[in-house]
Amino acid sequence: FLNIYSFIIGSFYNLKHLGYYTQADKWSKMGITALGQILGSSFLPILADMQDNRERLHRAISKMNKLTSFIIFPIYAGLIIVAEPLFRTLFGNKWDASILLFQLLIFRGIFTTLTVFLNNCILGIGKVKIMLYLEIVKDILSLIAIFITLEMGVTILVLGQVFVSILHYLLMAYISG
């Protein structure tokens, strides 16, 4: 299910659109994945130690969420702002159509990184089964978003992806407390 958007774009649009999306997706995931893994591996052991003290755990989750937001918002906002000159410097004008997609995917990355953090919170409090259900819900929401936005173009399709990431984050935030 990880590559469904590439599959959909490749199947319903032309290869040029797939190339633009792939370029934007590849570059957006580099920083998002690295930052998410660093934060996740740092916080999970701490949360696991607090599993038996719910009040202390919720305070720690709140502080860690604020710290995560404090770190990622400026980084991702900066990437969104410098996307155009960055792409033009690295790739020239031939990938200009990837810039908006990159910016949208970086915006999605804010919620993706926060969701990775909340995944660790849910694992830290021992609610492992809920993770499976949340992934199923996210996949269903993704399919609905694809179905609704498919005929509207690649940019709107990516906006649907962003919307699903926001909804998934909100569900995770609600469940993690």
What is the meaning of each model-derived region?
Residues 2, 25, 40, 100-126, ...:
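Short runs within selected transmembrane alpha-helices of multi-pass transporters and secretion channels
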Residues 8-29, 58-60, 96-102:
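Interfacial/gating helices of multi-pass transporter permease domains
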Residues 61-113, 143-151:
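Alpha-helical transmembrane segments of multi-pass membrane transport and lipid-handling proteins
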Residues 4-9, 13, 23, 39, ...:
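Hydrophobic/aromatic end-of-helix segments at the C-terminal termini of transmembrane alpha-helices
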Residues 9, 13-14, 82-84, 91-95, ...:
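Short helix-capping/hinge motifs at transmembrane helix termini and TM-loop junctions
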Residues 24, 28-72, 118-124:
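Helix-loop junctions and terminal segments of transmembrane helices
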